[in-house]
Amino acid sequence: MEEIQRYLQLERSQQHDFLYPLIFQEYIYAFAHDPGFSRSILSENPGYDNKSSLLIVKRLITRMYQQNHFIISPNDSNQNPFWARNKNLYSQIISEGFAFIVEIPFSLRLISCLEGKKKKIVKYQNLRSIHSIFPFLEDNLSHFNFVLDILIPHPVHVEILVQTLRYWVKDASSLHLLRFFLNEYYNWNSLITPKKASSSFSKRNQRLFLFLYNSHVCEYESIFVFLRNQSSHLRSTFSGILFERIYFYGKIERLVNVFVKVKDFQANLWLVKEPCMHYIRYQRKSILASKGTSFFMNKWKCYLVTFWQWHFSLWFHPRRIYINQLSNHSLEFLGYLSSVRMNPSVVRSQILENSFLINNAIKKVDTLVPIIPLIASLAKAKFCNVLGHPISKPVRADLSDSNIIDRFGRIYRNLSHYHSGSSKKKSLYRIKYILRLSCARTLARKHKSTVRTFLKRLGSELLEEFLMSEEDVLFLTFPKASSTLQGVYRSRIWYLDIISINDLANHKSKF
């Protein structure tokens, strides 16, 4: 038990940041049977498959070593009878166990200290929540002049992923295992967009692929770690957890030689130093906002492109980074079009017999609904054509009318809920019109009738009941407070659950 505590008590030492070698040792049995550890969030994770237990992984790896079937290559895996007969089962079990183990150092930040100690949560400086983006767009974006719109590229070779994990994982066998999986089933497009995955392996092993993608993105974000001491607005993950300290300092030395071939890092820090900067990211899209000038942002662009090409040994296309001036361009992020406009304000000032008119321009952030991409998504889901004209959608004959209307209404309510942070919500009326008429045409098609005849027989109130937004429901529930609620709904409202409902593709498959 003392040996386990040496691994788990990260508050004492940060030298054991990665626990993957435990999967090849007998400590794994203690992990599985320890009551304190079994009550942790690792064992209670609903996304973990019970069939892929750590004991099964341990026994499987031991069996592979004993039978000497682990020393194989992707070229002869098809001829190997051990691997060929149980290829799908073994790959899923091992990949789940691998992903489970490598998540331990990150999950242990929330686990209480073991055996008799006063329960306390180990504190770590971590990335801010994704929901901190919403107040940033509303409160802070208007204070910046330029933003770098960055699209994080895919790694061009699987060896880049292995090299990234090499500084975390100290066990050579685990790296060979990962390299074998990636060469056997590699499909990076399916890693990024699992819904379009063509590989059955990537569909069954989302946990492993999600970890690999997060580690890849985390390596790209490591470039901003050194700015943490320069700006209190920039939060980054604690470097002791993510990087080997020697490797981290070696990375900083490369920053010096990007522009000037000198050894003094502080003398060249002015190239990228800014008292107030913000960095936010959602999925592959990241933004670096600054109050600096266009020259300053071009320096940052050159710095990012050069460093990423040097560090990852790949060609980083400069067109993946756009320099946008907020006063002239809109920023597309999180399904919104954000822009900064000047709101003129005239103030009359009078001193004795003299009066003056003072013109003040106040910056205001507009978050708009991208109506054209939204209509394109509806057209792709067969709710309308490319011009936005509603069309009937083929449905199963066993679906009832109320079920069909409820599904259309759920899509509209989710879209209305997601875009509640928009400063101008009139664009949603177009979406409501498309879904409402598409629902009517779908029902008319089912009953082999026309839309006019169908609505005349059942009444238009039927659709209004199911295509009712949250605003309408609230007004009907509290009619006396309708005037106050109207003022509230004219403003932006950011709901904390919109991250899980922002994809229209989740609903089109239900028809």
From Swiss-Prot:
GO terms for cellular component: chloroplast. GO terms for molecular function: RNA binding. InterPro entries: Domain_X (IPR024937), Maturase_MatK (IPR002866), Maturase_MatK_N (IPR024942). It is found in: Plastid, Chloroplast. This is Maturase K. GO terms for biological process: mRNA processing; RNA splicing; tRNA processing. Usually encoded in the trnK tRNA gene intron. Probably assists in splicing its own and other chloroplast group II introns. The gene is matK. Belongs to the intron maturase 2 family. MatK subfamily. It comes from Paulownia tomentosa (Princess tree). Keywords: Chloroplast, mRNA processing, Plastid, RNA-binding, tRNA processing.
